[in-house]
């Protein structure tokens, strides 16, 4: 992605929601590499899909020759950003936030290149400059540059200020000052000239631009990426089981892969522009091919493979493919013990059974049928499989040969209703 027309290319991919002084920023980028940053507050022990677009935007800038700074908010994570939040955030302990900072730092690192010469990435933590700052210095050196009149008129906090039942604490109200100072501090330390973030961060970004101009007498810029929405109006990055996390121990590579496989046709080509590094020409060609093939579109599989490989690596992608193929075909011999553990992690219904349990009991316990009588009917009609093999004997009792890795049995009713049996030792 060439630096000279980077803004235009980002716009063509739909990746810019707002930008300050677009002409001046484009001109500055054309003059040569800049340093830019994006902040990630540790509000949980993992980043989620909502963080992926700004994180990949950092990578896009680095690929164009610019120097990215990934800022983890060890200090701001202790306060909580009120932007467009209906209620006050729960304050987490310093120890908890400290643990989350390290996890998120490790999560961000694989996306950027920290050893590529002049534009090598930098990892920073804003606790480094806020941790030793006393309240008098904060108020005198930072607070004096902020107008309360302007702060209360920012859209990000207006809704809270106008609600008598919730309001906003001074703690969260001060967040804007902290993030603003991040920009000024990074500008002074690393000559950072651009902040990027989600569109909900616009108010915080413009505060940082104003503060940097006042404190450092430097012109800097801001750019936001859009809030990702789905064509049906539902929230992106959420499932019935909750958020889709980037941490494999919270959302397995298989579930992550399936999330992308299930992307609607109306969204998939747009998501390829947001979440992959495929060229626009290749995405357009894929869309044209899908329209003319008369078959199920390939785009979902391309999207799932590209993003899963990027987040979970080749091994994670291979595991996701293996589980998907095994469940689809019913041939489980290729699945590993870790693959079964992924299914258990992903929320597949699980029951524990004692030795000697029969098939009818298992179907009822798994709530795949309401009664033993219904279980008999389902079994007799060849609607039940054990580890991918049909079982038509209503009186069937499980044996040791049904246990995969001496631990698991996969039960299925019909085509889509699964349960994983975990046998008690």
From Swiss-Prot:
Any one of the GO BP annotations: tyrosyl-tRNA aminoacylation
MF annotations from Gene Ontology: ATP binding; RNA binding; tyrosine-tRNA ligase activity
A Pfam entry, by short name: tRNA-synt_1b
Reaction catalysed by this enzyme: tRNA(Tyr) + L-tyrosine + ATP = L-tyrosyl-tRNA(Tyr) + AMP + diphosphate + H(+)
Gene3D superfamilies: HUPs, RNA-binding S4 domain, Tyrosyl-Transfer RNA Synthetase
Residue window of motif 'KMSKS' region: 235-239
Database matches in PROSITE patterns: AA_TRNA_LIGASE_I (PS00178), S4 (PS50889)
Binding annotation for L-tyrosine: 37, 175, 179
Top-rank lineage group of the source organism: Bacteria
Subcellular compartments: Cytoplasm
S4 RNA-binding domain segment(s): 357-414
UniProt keyword terms in alphabetical order: Aminoacyl-tRNA synthetase, ATP-binding, Cytoplasm, Ligase, Nucleotide-binding, Protein biosynthesis, RNA-binding
Residues noted as binding ATP in the record, renumbered to the chain: 238
Cellular component, GO annotation: cytosol
Motif ('HIGH' region) on chain: 42-51
EC number: 6.1.1.1
Description of how the protein assembles with itself and partners: Homodimer.
Function: Catalyzes the attachment of tyrosine to tRNA(Tyr) in a two-step reaction: tyrosine is first activated by ATP to form Tyr-AMP and then transferred to the acceptor end of tRNA(Tyr).
Protein family (similarity comment): Belongs to the class-I aminoacyl-tRNA synthetase family. TyrS type 1 subfamily.
Official protein name in the record: Tyrosine--tRNA ligase
Organism per entry: Pectobacterium carotovorum subsp. carotovorum (strain PC1)
Designated gene of the protein: tyrS
């Amino acid at each position: 992605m060439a630096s000279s027309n980077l803004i235009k290319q980002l716009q063509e991919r739909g990746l810019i929601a707002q930008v300050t002084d677009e002409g001046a920023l484009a001109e500055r980028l054309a003059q040569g590499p800049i340093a830019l940053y994006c902040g990630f507050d540790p509000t949980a022990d993992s980043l989620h899909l909502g963080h992926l677009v700004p994180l990949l935007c950092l990578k896009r800038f680095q690929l164009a020759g610019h120097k990215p700074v990934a800022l983890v908010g060890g200090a701001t994570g202790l306060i909580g950003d009120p932007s467009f939040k209906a209620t006050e955030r729960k304050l987490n302990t310093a120890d908890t936030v400290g643990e989350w900072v390290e996890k998120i730092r490790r999560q961000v690192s694989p996306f950027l290149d920290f050893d590529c010469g002049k534009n090598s990435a930098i990892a920073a933590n804003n606790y480094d400059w806020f941790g030793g700052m006393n309240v008098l210095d904060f108020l005198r050196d930072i607070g004096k540059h902020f107008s309360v009149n302007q702060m209360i008129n920012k859209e990000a906090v207006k809704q809270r200020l106008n609600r008598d039942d919730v309001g906003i604490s001074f703690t969260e109200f001060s967040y804007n000052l902290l993030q603003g100072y991040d920009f000024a501090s990074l500008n002074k330390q690393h000559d950072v000239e651009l902040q990027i973030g989600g569109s909900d961060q616009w108010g915080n970004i413009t505060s940082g631009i104003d503060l940097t101009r006042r404190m450092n007498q430097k012109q800097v810029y801001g750019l936001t990426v859009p809030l990702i929405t789905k064509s049906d109006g539902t929230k992106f990055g959420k499932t019935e089981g909750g958020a889709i996390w980037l941490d494999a121990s919270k959302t397995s590579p298989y579930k992550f892969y399936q999330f992308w496989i299930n992307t609607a046709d109306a969204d998939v080509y747009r998501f390829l522009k947001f979440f992959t590094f495929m060229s626009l020409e290749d995405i357009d060609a894929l869309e044209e091919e899908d329209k003319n093939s008369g078959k199920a579109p390939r785009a979902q599989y391309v999207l799932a493979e590209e993003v899963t490989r990027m987040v979970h690596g080749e091994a994670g992608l291979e595991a996701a493919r293996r589980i998907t193929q095994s469940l689809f075909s019913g041939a489980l011999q290729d699945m590993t013990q870790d693959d079964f553990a992924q299914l258990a992690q992903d929320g597949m219904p699980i029951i524990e059974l004692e030795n000697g349990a029969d098939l009818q009991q298992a179907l009822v316990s798994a709530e795949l049928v309401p009664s033993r009588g219904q279980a008999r009917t389902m079994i007799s009609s060849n609607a039940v499989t054990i580890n991918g093999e049909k079982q038509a004997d209503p009186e069937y009792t499980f044996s040791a040969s049904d246990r995969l890795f001496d631990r698991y049995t996969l039960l299925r009713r019909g085509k889509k209703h699964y349960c994983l049996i975990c046998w008690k030792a």
